[in-house]
Amino acid sequence: RNVANMVIHTDLNCLSVVQYAVDVLNIKHIIICGHTNCGGIKAAMGTVQDLGLISNWLLHIRDLWFKHGHMLGKLSPEHRANMLTRLNVAEQVYNLGCSSIIRTAWDKGKALSIHGWVYDVNDGFLIDQGVMATSRETLEITYRNAIAKLISEANELSEKTMHEKEVEQEIQKLQEALAEQTVAE
C-alpha cells in the first residue's frame, strides 16, 4: 500500500513484501487496486512542480500521463484523472509481473495470479480492469488488451464530450436568439 499503488523495481519495501507473500506465505493472488478520485494521480497531473519527496515518487505517473496525454487531454478533468488511474493500475500489474520475484515464481510453476482492480469511491464498487496475469504470456496479452480497451473508451468518452459541448453551444445559441426575439417584441 502506497501513494498511487505504485510498483517500482527499486522500492525494496514493496518488493520485500511481495517476496515474503509469494515465497513464504505461498499466496495465490495479488491485487493491484487503485481508486477513483486519487490524490496521487491528481497531483501527478497537476502543474505544481515541487511537492517535496512525493514529486519524485509521482514521476512514474507523470511519465504515464505524458505517454497517454494524446488521449487523456481531450477528456473532462474528472474522466481524465479516473482514466489515468485505470491506466496506472494496468501499468502496475505489468510492472509487478515483470519483477524477478513474480517471474521466478511463474518459472517454478507456482499458481500465482495478479489482478488489476479499481475501487470507485462514489458507489463502492470494485471494477475489474481486465488485466490479470497468471504467466508471462498472459501478462503481455492482458496488458495489451487492457491498454487497447482503455484507449478505445477514452476515444468514445472524448467523442461524447465533444458532442455534448456542441449540443450545449446550440442550446445557448437558441436561448440567445429567443432572448433577442423576446426583446424585439
Residue ranges, per PLM feature:
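Divalent-metal-activated hydrolytic enzyme cores
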Residues: A4-K28, G39-E185
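Ordered, amphipathic secondary-structure segments that act as subunit-interaction surfaces
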Residues: I30-T36
